[in-house]
Amino acid sequence: MNRFNLSLLITSLLLQFLGYSVNGQEYPCEKTMVESLQHTAWVLNKPESKALWNVSLNAPIIIIDHFNNKMFFTSIEDGRVQAIKEEPWDNKVPLANSFFDYEGKRYVTIIHAALMNSPCQQRINLLSHEIFHTYQKSLGIENQYSVNYYMDEVQGRALLQIELKALQAALSGDSMRLHDALYIRTYRQSLYPNNNEDLYELNEGLAEYTGVKLSTENMQEYVKNRLNYDISRGYTNAFGYFTGSAYATILDQIYAEWRYDKDLAKGLIYLIKKAEPQYAVTINKSTLDKLLIKYDYAQIVANEKEELKSFGDIEKFKDLLKPETSKLCIANQKINFTYNPNDRVISLGDAVLLRNMSIMGEWGQIKAKNGIVRMNNWSAFYLLPPTNITNNAIQGDSYEIQINQGWKVVEEHGIYSIVKE
């Protein structure tokens, strides 16, 4: 699976839908799966929904009930839900809120538990978000995976926190706070020139904006609440959902036609500055210093440094990047994987440390619960060396691997791999 396809699985898991309320709804939704699909189909078929992007948001859908090993096939077409067909899941489709090509056809994929454990309006949000992803290319918006790993480093997180605080006030019409948010953002991006914040924000932020816009009555309040900073959350993948929907909501206030602008693909910040040129930023040290004091940057940094200690011994995973260090290597060949994009990601230079991940390949399945290294070029994944190996299983420090028949573990000079027998 190439890097492009992998990114579709990673950035669209949207596990953060679990636990969020819409308009104060925290009670369970009593609608059945079919009723929720019908409700969503009705919403998407409304004239104002079609007018949002000048497209009809129809899509084939697979809903994956992994607890009962079932897949439900259906589609939303012009306000109607097509007859549902069921077949065994058997890991044939990645467990993700995303989209996936299956047997020659592209489907939106939805985790049954993520759908059914959400409030009623949030179900519309989830479905609309993922359906938007299948249409975004027609709007000039490319699928992107986040390379903004500094969002989980101390300085990057501290500056993001200031941007989120300023954005919350900006949503209420405070133009000075919008300037603050854009100033800090510009400064952060100058520190990390290889970022793709603006493009990733388009990818996930506009999908989030679409889902919220079609499901929530008080959109401004919802988006504000999503900007509340959580020091334990990972932001490398999550930030774009929050900042993107916030800047899109601000554009609704200052530039009503922004969704149809020919320069949409250049980013939301570009459109804000195009509509309101006074928000263009030139970094000045004196102004920057005053802004950092205003938002108590020093204390934010101190808090971030303390929180980083909770991740454990990062150095033992960084050592896996050394050629001579014993490790289990998983090559990126014909694999699918999922992980929680809410979780924190630690940059290791040429790789990142993820807290947990599931990987599926023709050789079997990995469940890593507390640390797995992924190379930045996506070529391989590294785990700490195994502590126990049997014919069909590998156990290590907080990970388990089930090995399929016809495969085995081999070791050479301390480097473990899974190969065909």
PLM region spans:
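Post-HExxH zinc-binding segment in Zn-dependent metallohydrolases
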Residues: 138-193, 197-223
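Bacterial N-terminal signal peptides
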Residues: 9-17
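Active-site-proximal alpha-helical
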Residues: 191-221, 226-286, 290
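Short pre-active-site segment immediately N-terminal to the catalytic Zn-binding motif
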Residues: 112-127
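Catalytic zinc-binding patch centered on the HExxH motif and its immediate surroundings
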Residues: 84-105, 117
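Non-catalytic terminal regions of proteins
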Residues: 263-421
